[in-house]
Structure formats: structure tokens, C-alpha cells
Amino acid sequence: MTLERDAASNVAKVLSEALPYIRRFVGKTLVIKYGGNAMESEELKTGFARDIVLMKAVGINPVVVHGGGPQIGDLLKRLSIESHFIDGMRVTDAQTMDVVEMVLGGQVNKDIVNLINRHGGSAIGLTGKDAELIRAKKLTVTRQTPEMTKPEIIDIGQVGEVVGVNTGLLNMLVKGDFIPVIAPIGVGPDGESYNINADLVAGKVAEALKAEKLILLTNIAGLMNKQGEVLTGLTTEQVDGLIADGTIYGGMLPKIRCALEAVQGGVNSSHIIDGRVPNAVLLEIFTDSGVGTQITNRKRH
């Protein structure tokens, strides 16, 4: 068998394996949080755009929510504006919020939209302020030490949390064969802007749309046990146990809680996948092995 025949045979095997998954997910909505290394490498960026376009072409409805922390940090540095973080959240005063909106809504969002469209998609860029897509309120952060009689409220500026999602707008775009690409900026009741964690926005969008899947691209291979082995399939109960015994800790906790809340809020499954792997999204949804950790509400028998 020639090399060309071998390659063709491999393609046929891949398509054969993917077909049952394509049939299962036709007409379903998948919310994908795009960030980390997957946004930095040209090869990975191109692969992501092609994945999104292919999903739409076979009848699946992708909705993209993106981050942009490093890009925000770079511009703040160039403008000689100091970055401060509390509990992993960027303290966002009015000046920093202007930069956040400029970078997320004006630069990163349009770059992603352009990339998807160059590969044959019809992407539309949005921030949460468009048609009040992401309604938000100020996030209350508290801290308490054993010496304190009551928690101290810490002001981290215009950092918000999601209180509502304009699903009518997203459903209209999806039905019109568009691919929504959302920057995680929320709008308050008086029109004020809020900087919101992209994972949290993706989770709330997935819940509101009753999405089939929430997919979070990360810079790790997936959730791991204490032996460093990737845990490919978990129930919400098992994840709770891993948090309780300290297997899941630190910076992964907010991401995992977001995935858990989405599943508990009606999303069929959440996926923590390795965005460093080319075509990670397709590998996770269209192959038997996947490239990360799937979390579901289904109990194991």
C-alpha cells in the first residue's frame, strides 16, 4: 500500500469514528472558552478557527467566549499602568477598564472573528454590552482572618459577575448560521462596564442556552489525580470529592467550579481540555479518546 493510500485510509478511519458523534451533536449548541496557549501559537490559532468552521459546517452550533489577560497586561505595561491582582482577579479601576474594553472588544475579539471568517466561517464579534448580552453586577469580594469579627469587603473596582444573558440575541445569530464570538465584558444596570472572568461568562452562557457542552481550553492536559494521571471522565460527585481531598486546588478551583455549576445548571457535560494540542476541540468531541477531562451529572453504577 502506498503512502498516499495509507494517508487516505487514515482519513477514512477518522471520518468513520467521527460520524456517530456528528450525528449526535447536529443542531446542538457547544460553548467554547478560548484562551491560554491556544491563542498564542499561529498553528494552534489556525487549528482552532478550522475546528470552529468545521463544526458549523456539519450542523453543530459553536458559541465562542474568549479571554485576553496577557494582551491586557501587555498594553497596561506599555502605558505604564500597574497591574494588581487580588485572589487571581485583576483590580480594575476606570483607567484599567478602558484598556480592558480596548483590548478585549477592539483587538482580541476582532482578531478571532477575522481568523474564523478567513477560514470560511461567518463569525460576528460581540461584547456583553451589545444588546445587553451579558448583564452584570459588581462582584463582592470579602476576606476574613481569625482575628476579625466580621469579613472585610475588598473593592476590586469594575470586576463583575453575570446576572443575566440575552439568549434571544444568541439564538437569532445561531439560527442565522452565524458564529457568535463574545468578549467577557458585562454591562450594569446604569450602563457601566464590568470586567468578568471569561470562564465564568462561558459557563453562564452555556447554562442560559442549555448547551450540550461547555468546553474550556486550558494549558494543562486535563484534571489529574495525585499520581499525575489524567482523569478522563468524572461525575460532579467525584469532582466534589477531589476538591475535598485536595487533589484539585489553587488556580484550577475557579475553572472547575465553573464547569461544575454549568453541569448542575443544565449543561449536559463540561470539558477541561488541553488547548496546547492541535485541533483539541475536534479531538475532544469527535473521537473516542478525547484530549482532556469530561464532567457530567450522571451517576456511575
Swiss-Prot record:
EC number: 2.7.2.8
GO terms for cellular component: cytoplasm
GO biological process: one example: arginine biosynthetic process via ornithine
InterPro entries: AceGlu_kinase-like_sf, AcgluKinase_fam, ArgB, Asp/Glu/Uridylate_kinase, NAGK-C
Protein's UniProt keywords contain Cytoplasm: yes
Location (main, coarse): cytoplasm
Protein's UniProt keywords contain Nucleotide-binding: yes
Catalytic activity entry: N-acetyl-L-glutamate + ATP = N-acetyl-L-glutamyl 5-phosphate + ADP
Marked site: Transition state stabilizer: K33, K255
Subcellular location: Cytoplasm
A Pfam family: AA_kinase
CDD domains, per the entry: AAK_NAGK-C
Record: residues binding substrate: G68, G69, R90, N195
SUPFAM superfamilies in alphabetical order: Carbamate kinase-like
Enzyme class, first EC level, given as a word: transferase
PANTHER family for this protein: N-ACETYLGLUTAMATE SYNTHASE, N-ACETYLGLUTAMATE SYNTHASE, MITOCHONDRIAL
Function of the molecule: Catalyzes the ATP-dependent phosphorylation of N-acetyl-L-glutamate.
Family according to the record: Belongs to the acetylglutamate kinase family. ArgB subfamily.
Protein name (record): Acetylglutamate kinase
Species name: Pseudomonas syringae pv. tomato (strain ATCC BAA-871 / DC3000)
